[in-house]
Structures are given as C-alpha cells and as structure tokens.
Amino acid sequence: MIDFGNFYSLIAKNHLSHWLETLPAQIANWQREQQHGLFKQWSNTVEFLPEIKPYRLDLLHSVTAESEEPLSTGQIKRIETLMRNLMPWRKGPFSLYGVNIDTEWCSDWKWDRVLPHLSDLTGRTILDVGCGSGYHMWRMIGAGAHLAVGIDPTQLFLCQFEAVRKLLGNDQRAHLLPLGIEQLPALKAFDTVFSMGVLYHRRSPLEHLWQLKDQLVNEGELVLETLVIDGDENTVLVPGDRYAQMRNVYFIPSALALKNWLKKCGFVDIRIVDVCVTTTEEQRRTEWMVTESLSDFLDPHDPSKTVEGYPAPKRAVLIARKP
C-alpha cells in the first residue's frame, strides 16, 4: 500500500499546511473508491523492490543511481523484471544500478530546452501538473528545488514514481499525488508551477490557466509547455475526432495566441522561449514502451502531417509571472 503519511507530516510543518484541510479526505476517498483494477498488482511490484541507498546519485544531469559495489547479476535481473512489470514507461530515461529504462520520450531533451530559461530553482517549492512518472520532478530536485510536488491521476504513473523513489533511497524531496488540478484548492503556495503536455487535453484551456495561477504565490513563475501550430495571435486549431490518434485533444493555439491567453488570465512578463517540432528520435517505441508511438501517428507519405492531415506535433515553451 502506498502511504502518503510522510507527505502529510512534511507539509504540516511548512506553508502548505492549509492543504491538510482537504487533502487527506481526498486521498482516502481515492483509496476507497477510485483505484484501478491493476493497482494492487502495481503497488505489490513496488513493495517487492529492494530499498537501496545510492552511493552515487546524479539528478542534475540525469536520473542516475549507482551502488558502491556493483549489484550481482541476480539483483539487477530482479530489479529489471519488477520494473518491466510497470510497463509502459513513457517519460524518462532512468539509469538505476545497471538497469537502463529507455522510455518512449527522451524527457531529458525537453528539460534541456526548458532549464536555461527558468528562474533559479534553488530552495523553491514546485508544483508539476500532469507530472507522469515524475522524471522532471527529480530533475527539479537536481537543479536545487527544496520540494517538488507532482499531481497526475494516472495510477500507473504513481506506482512508477514510487518504484523509482524506492530505488533512490526513499528520497522524500519529491512526492506524487493521484489528483487532477481541478481537485486542488487555490493554494497560492508554489514558487514555480509547471504544466507540460497538459493544456491541449483540457476542454477549457483558459480555465486551466486560471487554475495554474491559483497555485502560484505572488511573483511566482509559470512554465507552460504545450502543442502549438503556426499562425498569428488569432490562430487556433480545433481538431476533429482525433489529433495524432489522440481523442482528447481540444485546442491547439499558435504560440502568439497562447501568449494572449496568458495575458487575458492576468499573467505578465510572458515569454516564448522555445518552439520545436517533435521528432521520432525524441518520441519513439522502445523495449520499455512497445505499443504505437509518434511514427505511427504521422502520415507515412508526408511526416509534416499527422495521419488525420493536421500539422505534425510542434511544441512551445512559454514562461510567465503571476504579479
């Protein structure tokens, strides 16, 4: 059973303590009512993993843990088998005592694009919305963050995060909660809020931006990464039934339109810091994610288009401040 008691104890002593008015009841309800049919199997996998204190831990350049003495072949095989029980692995990569988890996404590429434009993360309390398996939270800790809190309702991601945490010596500087942002009160407590790969899945993108703003302290920083299309400040794509085979894509604005949306929600100092086309080198099928990936979602005769005929995925990073 995954226990959230450590997180409750941690925030009871800091400026997130008011979250305890609602959070334990929400988590208790989730534990009682909303667990996935495979959750017990996934959480048992986490239980079976050894808790190892890394001799060398690198979260600054990667997510890499090494022991002082190499693990035996049997120990490595056990860890690899258990981690494979938590497939598919989408966000990473992770290198854990000789087990190299080559995830669908090279999430380190995205981090390298984002990091140079961030305010110094040293000592910051961070919220990562739609955090997946938590890869970027560990990189935030590596960049000096005091505490990284991730929210993502996908329960496999929670178990993947807890598995990695256990292999990082039960590190308590990052925590993942199985919630969506709509379940959070207006905490106004985070120095930096990340929303990466979420906005286009929201039926009301401006409401999402307001929800992000409600989590920030005054003068806090928003890091927004999402799909965009080419065009002026009035250009927005509303896909039909699917976009790149995804059913739940609602609005894809141009970067300039997105900048206007942020302005409309009261953000200031809005910057478009990166725009790049997603390549099949960055997102692809691997041994750790064996189903369809980006190459299957693009027109085989024209990779500049999706199979539905829309522009192929292009992503922008915008940074803004809450006044």
UniProtKB/Swiss-Prot annotation:
What broad taxonomic lineage does this protein's source fall under?
Bacteria, Pseudomonadati, Pseudomonadota, Gammaproteobacteria, Enterobacterales
Pfam families assigned to the protein according to its UniProt record, in alphabetical order? Methyltransf_9 (PF08003)
Q: Which PANTHER family match?
A: PUTATIVE (AFU_ORTHOLOGUE AFUA_2G14390)-RELATED (PTHR43861:SF3), TRANS-ACONITATE 2-METHYLTRANSFERASE-RELATED (PTHR43861)
User: Which SUPFAM superfamilies does UniProt cross-reference here?
Assistant: S-adenosyl-L-methionine-dependent methyltransferases
Q: What's the family?
A: Belongs to the class I-like SAM-binding methyltransferase superfamily. CmoB family.
Q: Which InterPro entries does the record match to this protein?
A: CmoB, Mo5U34_MeTrfas-like, SAM-dependent_MTases_sf
Q: Name one GO biological process term.
A: tRNA wobble uridine modification
Origin superkingdom: Bacteria
- Alphabetized GO MF terms: transferase activity, transferring alkyl or aryl (other than methyl) groups
Reactions the enzyme catalyzes: carboxy-S-adenosyl-L-methionine + 5-hydroxyuridine(34) in tRNA = 5-carboxymethoxyuridine(34) in tRNA + S-adenosyl-L-homocysteine + H(+)
Q: What is this protein called?
A: tRNA U34 carboxymethyltransferase
Q: Would the keyword Zinc-finger be found if you checked this record's keyword annotation?
A: no
- Which leading EC class covers this enzyme? transferase
UniProt EC number: 2.5.1.-
Annotated coiled-coil segments of the chain: none
**Which residues hold carboxy-S-adenosyl-L-methionine?**
K91, W105, K110, G130, D152, P153, T154, I181, E182, M196, Y200, R315
- NCBIfam families documented for this protein: PRK15068.1, tRNA 5-methoxyuridine(34)/uridine 5-oxyacetic acid(34) synthase CmoB
- Source species of the chain: Shigella flexneri
Function, as annotated? Catalyzes carboxymethyl transfer from carboxy-S-adenosyl-L-methionine (Cx-SAM) to 5-hydroxyuridine (ho5U) to form 5-carboxymethoxyuridine (cmo5U) at position 34 in tRNAs.
Q: Which UniProt keywords apply?
A: Transferase, tRNA processing
> Is Transferase a UniProt keyword of this protein?
yes
UniProt-listed HAMAP family: tRNA_carboxymethyltr_CmoB
Q: How does it assemble?
A: Homotetramer.
